[in-house]
Amino acid sequence: MSLFPSLTLLLLSVVATSYSETVTCEDSQKICPAVIACNSPGINGFPGKDGRDGTKGEKGEPGQGLRGLQGPPGKLGPPGNPGSSGSPGPKGQKGDPGESPDCESSLAASERKALQTEMARIKKWLTFSLGRQVGNKFFLTNGEMMTFDKVKALCAEFQASVATPRNAAENRAIQNLIKEEAFLGITDENTEGEFVDLTGNKLTYTNWNDGEPNNAGSNEDCVLLLKNGKWNDIPCSSSHLALCEFPI
């Protein structure tokens, strides 16, 4: 066996090993097209170590994060300026006819006149049946007998006062009205012998019976109208006809 072929193969093997890191398969084929055949690539190796940090990059665009929950309402702001007037609204419906003041005044006057007429009729009925009218006074009795204090209370209840004649005409009207002796609104309870009306005013008209007032029994502080129209002082605790006068 010749040594030359073996030596040739050994030399080629050494050359292939020396250039295995830098010579590609294509280069090898160019150098030794007839001898060296390329194998298939091997499997990938393990990842290498991390390299050094690179230089700082440029600032990126703002990101879009997740939208948060709605916060609580803020404080009320100051009132705004008044707004401009709005446009006129639609025309309303036609209203009911109004009442004329002249008609109301005329109606009130008519009603007042009718009421006055009715009151005049009532006064005439009362005058005819129970009382007497003299001037602007109306004298009225209920026909009951009672003490002087009760007569005062009865008359006051009807906003009247105990009958007090101020002249002969009024005294005569009361005399014609009563069928029994009646109390008059005259006393000397405050000062003995000084008879005054129930408002404390001195009398300007009197019609005492002969010998009166005499204060018989020392307690005759009230005045009685006798059937003959004369006056007599009597005790206020006695009971006599109630007689009131009403201003009209």
UniProtKB/Swiss-Prot annotation:
KW Repeat (keyword) present: yes
Domain (C-type lectin): residue spans on this chain: 134-245
Positions with biased composition (Low complexity): 82-91
Secretion signal, residue range per the UniProt entry: 1-20
Keywords: Calcium, Coiled coil, Collagen, Complement activation lectin pathway, Complement pathway, Disulfide bond, Hydroxylation, Immunity, Innate immunity, Lectin, Mannose-binding, Repeat, Secreted, Signal
Gene Ontology biological process terms from the UniProt entry: complement activation, classical pathway; complement activation, lectin pathway
Modification 4-hydroxyproline occurs at: P47, P73, P79, P82, P88
Coiled coil: 112-130
Keyword Coiled coil found: yes
Function description: Calcium-dependent lectin involved in innate immune defense. Binds mannose, fucose and N-acetylglucosamine on different microorganisms and activates the lectin complement pathway. Binds to late apoptotic cells, as well as to apoptotic blebs and to necrotic cells, but not to early apoptotic cells, facilitating their uptake by macrophages.
Protein name in UniProt: Mannose-binding protein C
Organism in which the protein naturally occurs: Macaca fascicularis
